[in-house]
């Protein structure tokens, strides 16, 4: 662990200038300590960290690197390689539109456009109130329901641009 970047807080070492809440760091440390071994579990730990923090900024990546005893470059390499990891904050209700072949052919691009118009943001952005963000996915494996939209973990199938306003109203 790099003492120059961490400050002791109970059983957990958080970055000295941590912007994110300290209890969240403790949750990640407890998860790491529950593993039978650290080796081979970096992706699992990053999933946990992202579920706890909502995203993986460099501060969290350094924290994970320190506690997993791996170089920051290795953590960054994993985070930047896999598309399910994000280094930027998402909205409270992240919207993901599938752009796989079946979804695209059935109008997913028009659905994306409708979300962008309703929320007045672009892909990758977050609404000013922090409620929504929009991203696209390659394929979610539900081609029979194309086009598919996910809001958080909730899946919507056969979505049309006309349904976008109703979907947003649920949140």
UniProtKB/Swiss-Prot annotation:
It is an enzyme of class 1 (oxidoreductase). Its EC number is 1.12.1.3. Inhibited by oxygen. Binds 1 [2Fe-2S] cluster. Keywords: 2Fe-2S, Iron, Iron-sulfur, Metal-binding, NADP, Oxidoreductase. One of its GO terms (molecular function) is metal ion binding. Pfam families: 2Fe-2S_thioredx. Its cofactor is [2Fe-2S] cluster. InterPro entries: NADP_DH_HndA-like, NuoE-like, NuoE_dom, NuoE_N, Thioredoxin-like_sf. [2Fe-2S] cluster binds at residues 98, 103, 139, 143. It catalyses: H2 + NADP(+) = NADPH + H(+). Optimum pH is 8. Belongs to the complex I 24 kDa subunit family. Heterotetramer composed of HndA, HndB, HndC and HndD subunits. HndA and HndB could form a heterodimeric intermediate in the electron transfer between the active site of hydrogenase subunit HndD and the NADP reduction site of the reducing subunit HndC. Catalyzes the reduction of NADP in the presence of molecular H(2) to yield NADPH. This is NADP-reducing hydrogenase subunit HndA.
């Amino acid at each position: 662990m790099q003492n120059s970047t961490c400050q002791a807080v109970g059983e957990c070492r958080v970055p000295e200038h941590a912007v994110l809440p300290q209890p969240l760091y403790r949750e990640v440390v407890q998860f790491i300590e529950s593993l039978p071994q650290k080796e081979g579990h970096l992706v699992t730990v990053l999933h946990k960290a992202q579920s706890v923090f909502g995203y993986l900024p460099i501060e969290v990546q350094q924290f994970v690197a320190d506690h997993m005893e791996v170089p920051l470059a290795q953590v960054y390499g994993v985070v930047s390689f896999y598309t399910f990891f994000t280094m930027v904050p998402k909205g409270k209700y992240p919207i993901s539109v599938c752009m796989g072949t079946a979804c695209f052919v059935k109008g997913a691009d028009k659905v994306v456009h409708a979300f962008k118009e309703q929320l007045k943001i672009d892909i990758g952005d977050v609404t000013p109130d922090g409620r929504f963000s929009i991203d696209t996915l390659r394929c979610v494996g539900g081609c029979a329901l194309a086009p598919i939209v996910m809001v958080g973990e909730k899946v919507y199938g056969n979505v049309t641009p006309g349904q976008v306003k109703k979907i947003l109203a649920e949140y």
